[in-house]
Regions:
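Left-handed beta-helix
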Residues: 98, 103-104, 109-110, 114-116, ...
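Hydrophobic alpha-helical segments typical of transmembrane helices
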Residues: 17, 81, 133-134
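Hydrophobic, well-ordered beta-alpha structural blocks that scaffold small-molecule cofactor pockets
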Residues: 1-60
Length: 134
């Protein structure tokens, strides 16, 4: 059974990551979350949107994982939201495109994106919360 994830964010990058996870991963995206102050709609990409402040009531940490979908323009915010999700106890998932070239010895953290046409060579260690895009 595929693992279920919630995407943190409601941006064009969030929509792109929803598409990528849906089409190219074994994860099932079940919804989105955003900080209460940014709640504008109850759905995004046809899925429910939940206030982050209430997220663990709807999507408990033992049943769901998370992906923080904040792009390049708000890298500081991405780090803050990553830390908030970790503080609530969520495991954060990576997205690795099936069209990327990844070596078997890759050591990788959490909440990373490796898009298509990216080539990660031998002896590489990647930390948390990075985006690799060509």
């Amino acid at each position: 059974m595929p693992e279920k994830i919630v995407i943190y964010g409601l941006s064009a990058f969030s929509e792109m990551m929803y598409y990528n996870f849906t089409k190219y991963s074994d994860y099932t995206v079940v919804g989105f979350c955003v900080d209460q102050e940014y709640m504008k709609d109850e759905s995004f990409c046809g899925l429910p949107v939940v206030a982050f402040e209430e997220i663990e009531e709807v999507y408990p940490t033992h049943d769901y994982k998370m992906f923080v979908a904040i792009g390049f323009s708000r890298m500081r915010n991405r780090a803050l939201l990553f830390n908030k999700a970790k503080a609530k106890g969520y495991s954060l998932v990576n997205f690795i495109s099936p069209h990327a070239i990844i070596r078997d010895d890759l050591i990788i953290g959490e909440n990373n994106v490796i898009q298509s046409s990216v080539d990660i060579d031998l002896f590489v260690t990647i930390g948390d919360n990075n985006v690799f895009w060509t």
